[in-house]
Amino acid sequence: FLNPFRWVINKYR
């Protein structure tokens, strides 16, 4: 998994 996906999931949460 890439790092960019980290904030993406955080925002979707």
Curated annotation (Swiss-Prot):
Major localization listed first in the record, in broad terms: secreted
Keywords, ordered alphabetically: Secreted, Toxin
Gene Ontology cellular component annotations, sorted alphabetically: extracellular region
Domain of life (superkingdom): Eukaryota
Tissue specificity annotation: Expressed by the venom gland.
Subcellular location: Secreted
Keyword Secreted: yes
Record bears the keyword Secreted: yes
GO MF, any single term: toxin activity
Family: Belongs to the cationic peptide 04 (cupiennin) family. 06 subfamily.
Protein name: Short cationic peptide-6c
